[in-house]
Amino acid sequence: MKIIYIHQYFKTFTEGGSSRSYYLAKALVANGFEVEMITSHNSRDYVCAVIDGIRVHYLPVYYDNQLGFLGRIRAFIAFMWQAYRLAARLKNANLCYASSTPLTVGITALLLKKIKGIPYYFEVRDLWPLAPAQLGIIRNRWLKKLLFRAEQTIYQEAATIVALSPGIASYIRERNPGKPVYILPNISDCVFFRKEHKNPQLAHKYQVGGKFVITYFGAIGKVNYLQSLIEIARKAQQDHCHELAFMVVGRGNELRQIQAAAHKYNLKNLQFIPHLSKYQLREVLNVTDAVYVSFAPYPVLETSSPNKFFDALATGKLCITNTRGWIAELVQENECGFYADPQKPDDFLAKVSYYLADPEALEQAQYNARQLAETSFSRHLLINRFLKIFETKVPAPAIMTALHN
């Protein structure tokens, strides 16, 4: 069976960012499927490479988190058309697996179905256009109406939908009753990431020896709301909480603004680290005690399935989230961290002080995080669930029952 897998932001294991599509595509290849991955890169030329059995087509579409709204839209549209033209030339494809965001990836899949007769599965990582609409990024009511109509058509025409969180699945099921919808969250790589003792050499390298380290890693944009972490670090410095150190790892179009705020407050307890590879990130997480998962206070963002959270679980870190929703519920139910109101730095510091004062409680929470990763989100477990979707002899409703039991 030949599958066209479309993901604009495909990353291999050695690159920074989410490796979800790499792992899923690799699993398909290992189970006898032929996979043609269509993605993009920032080079000027088309490149085709075979990576662990996956034939990866890199289209020359520039994209960076620093891009503004119009720049991103141009990149989305360019990739949509280039991906369609390439996919339409691939022979003997049986199925398209399209992973959003952006929503335009779904339009590529829809065109393949309508013009080439290739059915598609649609993976929904974020609710788009609901997210940019709630955040006020898309304001024109006619454009919003057009995008929501396109979203609904993509859902209706998909043979199957894969949602990355319960909230996303509920949203889609309400609008598409009877449509097969699978919940397949992001993956905790419990093989690459492990719960480790702090390495003194790494603590010295990052100048955090003897500190309780709280780390944010990932994109730095409007949706990530890192102003909240700046205010926490500011309050900690004002209150002479010298035990605390903060690290921000990543890049994005609000990085300069966040750095300017840190400079304005003369924060000595916070450092910025550029975007890292997986191996470099593992070093930073070795010296980290708690990971901060941050989103702006919009309801749609409560449905997110942030890759950073699952990496934090795998490394056995105290998980702190400033967003309500299924992640906060998971953290609280499994006693591996806490929710902290982003508008109340005092609340954050009070909750952290409990773990500062009780190392055994910290160790237990970190152990619970690793256990949650192993029992609910491990690569082996979720890949097996993913592969069940492609068991053609099993009707989709039967697969759904199997996944929920």
Predicted segments with their positions:
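N-terminal subdomain of nucleotide-sugar transferases
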Residues: 1-55, 60, 231, 236, ...
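Membrane-proximal helix-turn-helix segments that form the acceptor-binding/catalytic region
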Residues: 84, 104-107, 111-115, 141-163
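Nucleotide-sugar-dependent
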Residues: 224, 277-284, 289-313, 320-329
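Nucleotide-activated donor-binding/catalytic signature segment of Leloir-type glycosyltransferases, i.e.
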Residues: 241, 249-250, 256-283
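Acidic anion/phosphate-binding donor-loop and adjacent secondary structure
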Residues: 173, 187-204, 225, 392-395
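A short, well-ordered alpha-helix in the C-terminal region of glycosyltransferases
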Residues: 347, 354, 361-375
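Carbohydrate-associated surface elements
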Residues: 41, 167, 186-187
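Conserved donor-binding/catalytic core segment of Leloir-type glycosyltransferases
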Residues: 207-234, 366
